[in-house]
Amino acid sequence: MISKLSVNPTFSPSYNIIVDSVLDFSHILEYVTNKQVLVVTNTTVAKLYLTKFLAALVDDLDVRTCILEDGEQYKSQQSLDKILSTLLENHFTRNSTVLVALGGGVIGDITGFAAAIYQRGIDFIQIPTTLLSQVDSSVGGKTAINHQLGKNMIGAFYQPKVVYTSIEFYKTLPQREYIAGMAEVVKYAFISKDFYLWLDSNRDKILAKDSVTLIEMVKRSCQIKAQVVAMDEKELTGARAILNFGHTFGHAIEKCQNYRGLKHGEAVGVGMAQAIDFSHYLGLISQQQAKDFNDFIVSFGISIDFPNDICQKEFLEAMLLDKKNSNKELKFILIENIGSLSLQKQSKNELEQFLDISR
């Protein structure tokens, strides 16, 4: 069973997202029109899927691999340099090269950024292997590496040639990673009331990993993101900002833990709860709404407990570095109801007071 949908960005060519019930890498062959292929993956995914992927490629291709360490802390300049050096050392050229990102969000982000900047742009293909990367980072063209002062601070908007994935990847995906991915899925429920109701009615099947339901879940999540990206590919109008619900707080958590604590999806889960509570503090939603929204997050096995190893001063400093901020104004994606999120400016003092009473 294959589900296919199209992403139509504002400034870039359209591309397909292919969600497969089985794992058949041959589906990407029609998109490998270049003769030089560099497969970027990590040590974990390489052991599980690299051999099978390489076996699916035709014999007349010049195929090389670049295997990075696994973890958010390796979404770095050093890892980027390793990819670029591999391309240069093997004389890969702009018009004959395609990069393949075989892995989760870190691999997709860093490979996409390498594709964006190598010889001013080469083709790349996304093969996301985690739920989080399937529904979020592989779609929409955001590519980046982290800096020691902030997450995703160095990057570019650059769309893939195609996204191919399969729910078969879940067979080797640790439960913790699966639940982390569910945080991004739940985020879309706060953006779309229809999806909120669908998730609510299919919760048991989702937690039981029913294959038909999971394919539909991934497809619906990608559709919501694709619709937003089509309106505001490069965050010029502000429409795309709603996709960052939970991320302002979440990114700050990751930064404070040096990307070695909560996983990205876990941090987003906590971040959504923080954004919900901040919305209540500001009078945008009632206490009952805040409870209902947080209970919805928790019902999918997602923790909303704030880490106790982060001090408030450090957390506040990390939030001040958020990319949405401008002219020293803090910007947050806040909630007024299901399907009603908005980008709002708040003062540093308002945030400090909220953090004081919420700890």
UniProtKB/Swiss-Prot annotation:
EC numbers on record: 4.2.3.4
Keyword Transport: no
Keyword vocabulary terms for this entry: Amino-acid biosynthesis, Aromatic amino acid biosynthesis, Cobalt, Cytoplasm, Lyase, Metal-binding, NAD, Nucleotide-binding, Zinc
This protein's name: 3-dehydroquinate synthase
Keyword GTP-binding assigned: no
Location (main, coarse): cytoplasm
Subcellular location: Cytoplasm
Pathway connected to this protein: Metabolic intermediate biosynthesis; chorismate biosynthesis; chorismate from D-erythrose 4-phosphate and phosphoenolpyruvate: step 2/7
Binding residues for NAD(+): 42, 70-75, 105-109, 129-130, 142, 151, 169-172
Cofactor binding remark: Binds 1 divalent metal cation per subunit. Can use either Co(2+) or Zn(2+).
Domain of life: Bacteria
Pfam families referenced in this protein's UniProt entry, alphabetically: DHQ_synthase, DHQS_C
Binding site for Zn(2+): E184, H247, H264
Provenance organism: Francisella tularensis subsp. tularensis (strain SCHU S4 / Schu 4)
InterPro entries: Dehydroquinate_synthase (IPR050071), DHQ_synth_AroB (IPR016037), DHQ_synth_fam (IPR030963), DHQS/DOIS_N (IPR030960), DHQS_C (IPR056179)
One GO cellular component, as annotated: cytoplasm
